Regions:
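Noncatalytic, helix-rich "gating/capping" subdomain that lines the substrate-entry/channel surface
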Residues: 31, 35-36, 73
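Short alpha-helical segments and helix-capping/turn motifs at coil-helix boundaries
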Residues: 38, 57, 164-170, 241, ...
Length: 346
């Protein structure tokens, strides 16, 4: 079951899209949505979350090309629409009244700059399909196609010059009292009830009169590793197949390195050790079935999943673990500049 609320606005004029003003508006709205989505995502990590999923965004209103909309959406269990929708509207109202914190903005800005920097680094590896999509959007909607060589320095300049105070003015401009559309999607079956239009409007009105408090951003300044591990040594170097290099470390680990030109801003890693679920006893069969699903929810060391995402803000790095029948596996990828962070996560 899901509920959507749309706050409609006139679309940015097509004949003015080829301006820095258009890039500035897109940046500011994107930052506001990114930070609000971060708050909503945090709420799904608690023991009894108020909804299954929730998020906000800004795009064309359905199929319209002359109207855009700031959209809030929440997915919830059957018959829990009132409470879930109330929570969504409360967080939107909180952002409208108090804005975002400086630390939230620094993380959002760091992640944004990392993404545009990565795109710029990979500009010579862009697939033809991406060019086709860009040209179609330019032809239909007059979206700019200046190219990354032009857009990248402008994007960095915009991010450097716009403070969080300016971003905090975005949500109040998008949340209006008129031109609101709400939709509900859910199963048509016995026992499932849905709120009326007036009930949804009453929820919005009640939230607006609540005495809300500002969001508190809890950030840890602790490093990923509390202490540096003792370094090992390379005891053997040899040539491998297909132009690879094989290193044998003092702890017995074999490292196979293979340089490629597929991507300019990515290092991929795959680590495997023998063992897997085959070494568990039969009494652990039920737990083993859930092992891989649960492993990714536990964060890292003393950092919860929420805290870890904040610590890794601005870094292009991902890491995952899995247990197969005969092996334990670690996989990851990162930008070359974040290689040390990836190794710390391992």
């Amino acid at each position: 079951t899901s509920v959507q609320i749309y706050y409609k606005h006139p679309a940015f004029p097509n004949n003015q899209k080829n301006t820095v003003q258009y890039m500035v508006q897109n940046y500011m709205i994107s930052m506001a949505c990114r930070m609000l989505n971060g708050r909503l995502s945090e709420m799904t990590q608690v023991a009894n979350p108020p909804f299954i999923n929730a998020g906000v965004g800004h795009s064309d209103f359905l199929l319209s090309k002359t109207t855009t909309a700031f959209t809030g959406s929440v997915t919830c269990k059957e018959n829990e629409i009132p409470s879930s929708f109330t929570t969504l509207m409360r967080e939107i109202e909180r952002a409208k009244k108090f804005g975002f914190t400086a630390s939230e903005y620094e993380r959002a800005k760091a992640n944004y700059l990392t993404s545009v920097e990565s795109a710029y680094s990979e500009r010579n590896k862009i697939k033809n399909g991406s060019y086709v999509n860009a040209y179609v959007r330019h032809f239909i909607d007059n979206e700019p196609i200046a190219g990354l060589e032009v857009e990248y320095p402008i994007a960095k300049q915009i991010a450097a010059q716009i403070p969080v105070e300016a971003i905090n003015q975005v949500i109040p401009q998008l949340i209006t009292k008129e031109n609101i559309v709400m939709t509900i999607f859910g199963p048509d079956k016995e026992g499932v009830t849905y709120p009326s239009e007036q009930e949804l409007l009453d929820i919005i009105k009640n939230v607006q009169t609540e005495e809300l408090t500002a969001y508190v951003d809890k950030v840890s300044n602790e490093p990923l590793l509390s202490e540096e591990p003792t370094g090992g040594k390379i005891v053997k170097t040899e040539k491998g197949v297909f132009g690879s290099t094989v290193l044998t470390l003092s702890n017995g680990i074999r490292v196979i390195m293979k340089p490629t030109e597929f991507k300019a801003d990515q290092i991929q890693l795959q680590a495997v050790s023998p063992g897997g679920t085959s070494v568990f006893g039969t009494e652990d069969v039920e737990q083993i079935r859930l092992l891989n699903n649960i492993a990714g929810l536990g964060g890292y060391g003393k950092f919860s999943l929420i805290e870890l995402s904040k610590v890794l803000a601005g870094k292009k790095v991902s890491m995952g673990t899995s247990v197969g029948t005969l092996t334990e596996n670690v996989s990851g990828s990162c930008s070359p500049k974040d290689f040390e962070t990836m190794m710390q996560l391992i």
